[in-house]
Amino acid sequence: MNSERRGVLLDTSVLINLLHRRKEPVALIRELSLRGFVLATSAVNVAEIYAGLRIGEEQETRDLLSTLKCLPVTPKIARKAGDITAARRRIGRTHWLDDMMVAATAIEHGYTLLTDNRKDFEIPEIELFSA
């Protein structure tokens, strides 16, 4: 991971793994935090997490999300996401708009995107890292 980038945006796949206490992402997040990285997520990821919330996970989910900086989707980010989606469609590659909003958020803030779904974010402008 590029040491000049001091922020890491956690994608929904990583948040789910943290909620399920999978060892690899928990250890990685702990290390990133100790190394001084800002740990963040997007408002889009928050919506995705709450949409798939299981009964009994409410408090644990709130606790996890409260430890992260939540980056909003601004009009500039929304436009960037639309531009990326349209450009990818023109070359025959389709991506979900919600994923492109997450990608645009990471790009706009200069954050590395931590995801377990690299194929969803195959765009040249973004730095990806996997747990």
What are these regions (language model features)?
Residues 11-12, 49, 81, 106, ...:
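Generic structural signal for small/hydrophobic residues in well-ordered secondary structure
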Residues 2-6, 69-116:
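Active-site neighborhoods of divalent-metal-dependent phosphate/nucleic-acid chemistry enzymes
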Residues 1-41, 50-66:
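Short, well-structured N-terminal submotif of metal-dependent ribonuclease cores
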Residues 68-69, 125-130:
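Active-site regions of enzymes building and remodeling cell-envelope glycoconjugates
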Residues 15-16, 47-50, 122, 129:
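Nucleotide phosphate-binding site architecture
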Residues 14-15, 45, 77, 101-102, ...:
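Alpha-helix capping/helix-boundary segments
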Residues 55, 116-119:
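Short, polar loop motifs at secondary-structure junctions
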